Curated annotation (Swiss-Prot):
One Gene Ontology term from the biological process aspect of the record: translation
Protein name: Aspartyl/glutamyl-tRNA(Asn/Gln) amidotransferase subunit B
Species this protein is from: Clostridium botulinum (strain 657 / Type Ba4)
Family, similarity comment: Belongs to the GatB/GatE family. GatB subfamily.
Catalytic activity as recorded in UniProt: L-glutamyl-tRNA(Gln) + L-glutamine + ATP + H2O = L-glutaminyl-tRNA(Gln) + L-glutamate + ADP + phosphate + H(+); L-aspartyl-tRNA(Asn) + L-glutamine + ATP + H2O = L-asparaginyl-tRNA(Asn) + L-glutamate + ADP + phosphate + 2 H(+)
InterPro entries in the record: Asn/Gln-tRNA_amidoTrfase_suB/E, Asn/Gln-tRNA_Trfase_suB/E_cat, Asn/Gln_amidotransferase, Asn/Gln_tRNA_amidoTrase-B-like, GatB, GatB_C_1, GatB_Yqey_C_2, Gln-tRNA_amidoTrfase_suB_CS
Statement: the UniProt record of this protein carries the keyword Protein biosynthesis: yes
Length: 476
């Protein structure tokens, strides 16, 4: 019997506001423990919350970007639970009437087909504090308590771990592009829980689901869902009874581990938050927010394909972050060579950034300098290989490529006569390579080309070298 996964994701995104959702404390990441707190976010008696207007605006903005309808009348609710990281012993969230409903994200599958993943709801809520477990006991830092979140709940439309990853990547790119969240998974500002069950292919009935936590990267999400799918299929095949439970992903051992049996909604005893009034959102307010939404990543990718003629894959990669998209577009326009701009950014520049763990905004050179490098190569002033060395220098120093080329004497030699003299000398000194070539070993020419490039210290035009080596070898 063949099985399919039924997957839904719950994504928490910390909002990029300066202050917390119900008080004026800073949301800045880091800081000494328990220094970004006040009576409101500590839940002290007599303190009253006041809803941050910017949080509501960001909730509306996210909803519009994700094709949701906005609930014009919504309210905040109390979710009651007892845990050390929740100082009030309840969380102010939204239950029955969230700010957004019924949206979707469109992802592209491996076969090129597009698939809509439904979004059931988006609701606003506050984050909890952070627990630090030590040998001496458990410490609590409430700096994060009260930081504003939106929780984006997908419908169970996802069928594979790969689809789940594509959905989360697309969601992350949209949220960061509209600047409602910085989506830094390593800092916990984008967190994802997954719900998964399995059922026979063709069945409409849902199986018993597990919720998986602690998936703090795209790789962890895919591996955890794959592991849990295999675990469910094995259990069902053996006739074992699965129970609804919450599990966490153990990265070190690549397994999911039981945390607790899954709670039900009524375990939290939701009821309306009496200290906050019902929220009324006007059409005028919605339209004001709509005007602040920039070109979305998938829209930008489509424009890049049409305007610059680059492949769809390149456009999708370049628009994963708006900083990269902006850098590419400026370089493409200034260099008048969009494909070269794409190749440099997706290739050598991305490699250098990964090695140093930096982002596009941290680069020491700008699009105009990269465009200048591309023009030097296209004008045959330097070779592509020399260009890579110049880029390394630009990456370290931020110098202009023209200055680097002049300082280091890297101008390409395009003089066929001068190069021919070197080619003849190399061939004369390597008769065995000519014999190998005559005997059908084509690699022998590559060896000779390499010697010529070494002799000219990489300055000879590679195209001219290849042509002359081939011509001279065929004369022998």
């Amino acid at each position: 019997m063949d099985f399919e996964a039924v997957i839904g994701l719950e994504v928490h995104a910390e909002l990029s506001t300066n202050t917390k959702i119900y008080c004026g404390c800073t949301t800045e990441f880091g800081g000494q423990p328990n220094t970004h707190v006040c009576p409101i976010c500590l839940g002290l008696p007599g303190s009253l919350p006041q809803l941050n207007k910017r949080v509501v605006e960001y909730g509306i903005k996210a909803g519009l970007a994700l094709n949701c309808s906005i609930n014009k009348v919504c309210r905040m609710d109390r979710k009651n639970y007892f845990y050390p990281d929740c100082p009030k012993n309840y969380q102010i969230t939204q239950d029955e009437v969230p700010i957004c409903r019924d949206g979707y994200i469109e992802i592209e599958l491996e076969n090129g087909e597009k698939k809509k993943i439904g979004i059931e709801r988006i609701h606003m809520e506050e984050d909890a504090g952070k627990l630090l477990h030590t040998n001496a006991g458990t410490l609590v830092d409430y700096n994060r308590a009260g930081v504003p979140l939106i929780e984006i709940v997908s419908r169970p439309d996802i069928r594979t771990p790969e689809e789940a990853t594509k959905y989360l990547e697309k969601l992350k790119s949209i949220l960061s592009s509209i600047e409602v969240s910085d989506c830094k998974m390593e800092q916990g500002s984008l967190r994802c829980d997954g719900n998964i069950s399995v059922r026979p292919v063709g069945s409409e009935k849902f199986g018993v689901r597990s919720e998986i936590k602690n998936m703090n990267s795209f790789k962890a999400l895919e591996k955890a869902l794959s592991y849990e799918y295999d675990r469910h299929v094995e259990a069902v095949t053996k006739g074992e009874i699965l129970e609804q439970e919450t599990r966490r992903w153990d990265e070190a051992n690549s397994v999911t581990v039981l945390m607790r049996s899954k709670e039900k909604a009524n375990d939290y005893r939701y009821f309306p938050e009496g200290d906050l009034v019902t929220l009324n959102i006007s059409d005028e307010w919605i339209e004001e927010v709509r005007k602040t939404i920039p070109e979305l990543p998938h829209e930008k990718a489509e424009r890049f394909v049409n305007e610059f003629g680059i492949p769809k894959y390149d456009a999708m990669v370049l628009t994963l972050t708006m900083d990269m998209a902006k850098f590419f577009e400026e370089t493409a326009v200034k260099s008048e060579d969009a494909k070269a701009a794409s190749n440099w950014l997706m290739g050598d520049i991305s490699r250098l950034m990964n090695e140093k763990t930096i982002e596009v905004k941290d680069l020491k050179f700008n699009p105009e300098q990269l465009a200048q490098l591309i023009k030097l190569i296209n004008a045959r002033t330097i070779s592509n290989n020399i260009g890579k060395k110049v880029l390394d220098d630009m990456f370290k120093s931020g110098k202009n490529p023209k200055d680097i080329v002049e300082e280091k004497g890297l101008v390409q030699n395009n003089d066929e006569g001068a190069i021919l003299e070197v080619v003849k000398k190399i061939i004369e000194n390597n008769p065995q390579s000519i014999e190998d070539f005559k005997n059908g070993k084509k690699r022998a020419l590559g060896f000779l080309v390499g010697l010529v490039m070494k002799e000219t210290k990489g300055k000879a035009n590679p195209q001219i070298v290849n042509k002359l080596v081939s011509e001279e070898a065929n004369k022998m």
